[in-house]
Amino acid sequence: MAEFKVVIADPNTGETFQREVDGQDANRFLGRDIGDEIGGDAVGLSEHTIAITGGSDETGRPMREDVSGTRLKELLLEGGVGFEPSREGERKRITVRGREIDNDVAQINVSVVEGDDVAAALGEGDADADDADEE
């Protein structure tokens, strides 16, 4: 059975939220690619649309949009997802995962593309800040 940690990014505020999904909610992500848009019901955002922006497997290998399927592939990278060079011209062979989500993926990164007030929809409103404003 699939189980994922989903990191939800709100581009309007710059905040991120984490949710654990399993069972039927996790099955909605299986077989989807980076860039696919789906309904936010799986992560508790019923009136929102989310887009898959990336992820990583249980060993920390990043998913890359330019690698097809769910396979692992060794790439000689000059930069980008999976490698940040420390000097100009540096290249390194890195193992990355394909763009399709399967059971080996541990974390999925998503971004909200349609909808507003993600914090309120997830029930993570800042109650302490509201109390401070009233005083």
From Swiss-Prot:
InterPro entries cross-referenced by the UniProt entry: Ribosomal_eS6, Ribosomal_eS6_arc, Ribosomal_eS6_CS
Record key words, sorted: Ribonucleoprotein, Ribosomal protein
A GO-annotated cellular component: ribosome
Pfam families: Ribosomal_S6e
Swiss-Prot/TrEMBL GO biological process terms: translation
Highest taxon of the lineage: Archaea
Molecular function terms, GO-annotated: structural constituent of ribosome
Stored HAMAP family: Ribosomal_eS6
Family: Belongs to the eukaryotic ribosomal protein eS6 family.
PANTHER family: 40S RIBOSOMAL PROTEIN S6
Designated name of the protein: Small ribosomal subunit protein eS6
Source organism per UniProt: Halorubrum lacusprofundi (strain ATCC 49239 / DSM 5036 / JCM 8891 / ACAM 34)
Organism lineage string: Archaea, Methanobacteriati, Methanobacteriota, Stenosarchaea group, Halobacteria
